[in-house]
Amino acid sequence: MKFIGLATLSLFALASADKFPVPDSITVAEGSSKCGDQAQLSCCNDVKYGGDTTVVQKGIAAGLLSDLLGAGSAAEGLGAFSGCSKLDISLLIGIEDILNQKCKQNIACCAKSGGSADGDLVGATLPCIALGSIL
């Protein structure tokens, strides 16, 4: 009986673990610099990643452009993040604050854009990418 409880707890821990964890030593400033000037360091409540795909390539030039276009494992880390709030460096008191202490959920780099999908027929907002996938 104890084994079943331990096995269930272990499976739950694996399922709830972050897919792209951020090391404990990364500061907010370092995380922001990894995002670059075109993205904003954000803390997101929820994320949904697309499923893994397997593509069988046939022929001489098969799959030549697939990695350039974002197919397969090249799209790793891209997800649908929701409930994101920006982590602004200028508002933080200590610039050396540890990132994992400021955000306990999903840490991501979200594109800086004024775009919004609200009230638009074909509205789209740019996605976020998990910070742990680019470290």
Curated annotation (Swiss-Prot):
Provide the organism lineage as a comma list: Eukaryota, Fungi, Dikarya, Ascomycota, Pezizomycotina
**What triggers its expression?**
Expressed after 12 to 24 hours post induction of asexual development, which correlates with the development of metulae and phialides. Not expressed in hyphae and strongly induced during development.
* SS bonds (residue pairs): 35-109, 43-103, 44-84, 110-128
Q: What does this protein do?
A: Aerial growth, conidiation, and dispersal of filamentous fungi in the environment rely upon a capability of their secreting small amphipathic proteins called hydrophobins (HPBs) with low sequence identity. Class I can self-assemble into an outermost layer of rodlet bundles on aerial cell surfaces, conferring cellular hydrophobicity that supports fungal growth, development and dispersal; whereas Class II form highly ordered films at water-air interfaces through intermolecular interactions but contribute nothing to the rodlet structure.
Q: How does it assemble?
A: Self-assembles to form functional amyloid fibrils called rodlets. Self-assembly into fibrillar rodlets occurs spontaneously at hydrophobic:hydrophilic interfaces and the rodlets further associate laterally to form amphipathic monolayers.
Identify the InterPro entries for this entry.
Hydrophobin (IPR001338)
Q: Which GO terms describe its molecular function?
A: structural constituent of cell wall
Subcellular location(s) per record: Secreted; Spore wall
Instruction: Classify the main location.
Output: secreted
Task: Give the organism, scientific name.
Answer: Emericella nidulans (strain FGSC A4 / ATCC 38163 / CBS 112.46 / NRRL 194 / M139) (Aspergillus nidulans)
Name of a matching Pfam family: Hydrophobin
What the record says about family reads: Belongs to the fungal hydrophobin family.
Keywords assigned by UniProt? Answer: Conidiation, Disulfide bond, Secreted, Signal, Sporulation
Q: What is this protein called?
A: Class I hydrophobin dewB
**GO CC terms on record?**
extracellular region; fungal-type cell wall
Residue span of the signal peptide, if any? 1-17
Coiled-coil stretches? none
